[in-house]
Amino acid sequence: MAILGMGTDIVEIARVQAIIARSGDKLAHRILTPLELSEYQQHQQPVRFIAKRFAAKEAAAKALGTGFRNGLELRHFQVIHDELGKPHLLVSDKANEMAVRLSVKSWHLSISDERHYAIALVIVEG
């Protein structure tokens, strides 16, 4: 397989905290899938949860080479974890259409955070 695209994104956690303080759960409802929203509502560190999901989804859109345009939305990407905690991306709707068009066979996702930032890297292969 060949690398078809790569995307990375970094999010300042304090910025996400400020958005949530101003608008409550509006950000969560805008970017999270129903499954992610359920996880967010039960998470011990909800601000970090959203920051990492946002970074992952932005990185995924960049890896497709499009960013968020032509109908692609943050909720078209979903982050899940396997039994060891490794993150994986699921794609739907426009994200899936674009992945099929590009002949994407696999997605690789890495997410990390520290005191002030969350970062994600996505590599797509086909």
Swiss-Prot record:
InterPro entries: 4-PPantetheinyl_Trfase_dom (IPR008278), 4-PPantetheinyl_Trfase_dom_sf (IPR037143), ACPS (IPR002582), Ppantetheine-prot_Trfase_dom (IPR004568)
Any matching Pfam family: ACPS
Residues involved in Mg(2+) binding: 9, 58
Xref: HAMAP family: AcpS
Protein source organism: Hamiltonella defensa subsp. Acyrthosiphon pisum (strain 5AT)
Needed co-factor(s): Mg(2+)
Keyword terms: Cytoplasm, Fatty acid biosynthesis, Fatty acid metabolism, Lipid biosynthesis, Lipid metabolism, Magnesium, Metal-binding, Transferase
Catalytic activity: apo-[ACP] + CoA = holo-[ACP] + adenosine 3',5'-bisphosphate + H(+)
Compartments where located: Cytoplasm
Family per record: Belongs to the P-Pant transferase superfamily. AcpS family.
Protein name (database record): Holo-[acyl-carrier-protein] synthase
GO molecular function, one term: magnesium ion binding
GO CC annotations, alphabetized: cytoplasm
GO biological process: fatty acid biosynthetic process
NCBIfam families: acpS, pantethn_trn
EC numbers: 2.7.8.7
Its biological purpose: Transfers the 4'-phosphopantetheine moiety from coenzyme A to a Ser of acyl-carrier-protein.
